[in-house]
């Protein structure tokens, strides 16, 4: 029976190393399908209700005795399940995160566009902002582990971390969002210091705060700005994905339209039913994948062989092929297996199906893959054995092998079903690890890393930098070439073991290139020794003739596993990355170029210099050593190859140290004397040269004898100032300002925002004093939308008189010296007009007014046509009293004021009227009451002409109460123009700070902000267009 059993199985070698993974003649029936699965048919209505077929739910099959019995087991309502999760390690609770609830609310509103969609309640926004923290921690933890390899976090580590944590569909969406943000950022390189990173990327979340959070959580000692942009874009995209799914479930038709408000309960319901979101947003350390809150296993809809009802190319598929296709979906949801052969068969068929449906690798351009078709990923035998260790089930082993009796007693507890990820997730995570290594083979290390991520209570160290050869590439070589490759692998292993006495034999085994041979990662033995800090081996390799300045190649089929960010690195670069100062000194003494490949390479060999890497890490000793050997902190600014670097994440050394908050390193860099090199000017700089020189001279004269900065160093320090302000290192920003580096408006606003949020009012005061040094050409929309809002917020909350006086000076400065816009007259002719002789004349009068006990005679025909107020008054009087009484009493108005108002009506205008100054406001009130717009506007003009420091506050209140907007606007301009002096008056302070203003419905500070914003926009922005 054993022989019969074994004869039905393929060998492990056949299952893992044959051409069936990518060949078209193996598992051919997997491409055939003639019907949907029953499970999908049952769940199609549920998917339609959700509006988007994100996931397909599969029911269990009537299988025989294999791993498919574990699929979609109904989770019993057992309190032990809750107790089980309570014992699982939980994610850390951090106090600070790089967003606020307001930021999340703005992202949710931005996603709605111009459509009228249900709004998220405040509680739902608060709940979502809290749940996002867990997703961020998961991605950050994986990026932190991936960054160990090169002691550096780039966009590649962030993108791989997102793919590890999120499902394929969600990760692809996040990758597209990151690509969009990075593209916008690169295309806006010309506005570098004028706009914030988030504005340049088109993001709502703050890229600067994300960068600072990554530094504070020590994801790596070096953080690239593109890594922060990618992480910001991914988290913002996650909010938009959640919003879209909530909207799809909120409306019956799935289009998102509908009334009402999205509650926190509705949000949680959508997340609990979504297998892509629920596990990611749980508080446990291990990642729950492919399951929703009910424990239902799920498969991505786009991966399902039955998705969309697509049929195979052979319509005559037999029943066996249909059954095989149906079982494939169940196979991917298996949580345990009974034998290594079964696992090998499942993995092989799944890989074949994946490569058939997804010919393009995620994140790679179709054009590049058309030139270099992607090779299929294979699984090494040790990877399958390791995976089987985590998926094996003793009971199923006994069922698979009739010769194996089940154990009478077990020494180990089986993991509960809720803790078992499906096979699909094991494969997804392991393949992602292999792809991050640029390897075509999944090895046992990838499986161990996946187990650490997917299972609770497991841990292992991150992958270390060591020689690795692509095992699958050997199979594509002939016997002789494969032998040479294995010998080369042996030579690297001999050198990697640390025995210097084997160096000659190892060099002989490496092949014709000898000690300069490169492995699949494009690295030489000297690079590995430098990364490991092995001084003895480095010295031996140098003595053996190793090339010190050889670079990691850019793109080469001979080296398929090169990490994209390591291209053009030299041995010195690796030593600096890992902080081995003794090895750095050894290489420099031996003649290694201190700038790495930045000078020796060709035009396409962009790479960060060792000094840039040391500056980013804050390694003071390394920076000092490299500077003493002639490293140039301004090398990137000089553009040695004559090409821009906006696509290369380029930052100069000053920027690296400032961005990471290393003040001591920045100070050390500043001690380096300026080199006497001719400044290369752009056309914009040539045209603005006169203005900038005068500005720079004025800046330098205010400081205590600083050395005059060259144009190149000024530009570099201004860039460093930008990064320190964006990332919240206000002390570094102020220190650079003290050197005479001129302000950019955005840098000033960010520094003020940080200082205010930290309640550092001494810095706030210093910044406010320095506002006048910013050139008016810098004033832009950011000053209108953010700068003024920030300054008025400070004015509302500050109790420091000095700060308040500085703000008043700034507001007056921004308002400008030009006069306040005058109030225009209303040229309006009255519809009817009588001779002035009839004014208060009893003759022919048909209506009488009683004002202060005195009668005033008038004529209806004139009054009714003068305003709707008079017409309504006449109509109401006739209906109430009939013709018995024609006297209308006017209260709360003086007789002579009423008389002047009537004089305006009978004279037909204001030309012949003489209005005493003391009566202007009362006449304005009367004109407003009786809706005489022209008279009211004339009174507003008279008030504006007589406005003084003493009467301004009272006039403003009158204008607000009696609906005189033009006069109120004029008063606000008067306030802004004389604000510093007005702040000395109690009446003005009571107006802007007192509670009585709020009781009266006044918000003078908001009105002042709006008026100043319009003024700045018209004077400084619109006029330049």
From Swiss-Prot:
CDD domains: BACK_ABTB2, BTB_POZ_ABTB2_BPOZ2, HFD_ABTB2-like. ANK repeats lie at residues 521-550, 567-596, 606-635, 649-678. Transmembrane segments: none annotated. It holds the Pfam family Ank. The keyword ATP-binding does not apply. Keywords: ANK repeat, Repeat. One of its GO terms (molecular function) is protein heterodimerization activity. GO terms for biological process: cellular response to toxic substance. SUPFAM superfamilies: Ankyrin repeat (SSF48403), Histone-fold (SSF47113), POZ domain (SSF54695). May be involved in the initiation of hepatocyte growth. This is Ankyrin repeat and BTB/POZ domain-containing protein 2. It comes from Homo sapiens (Human).
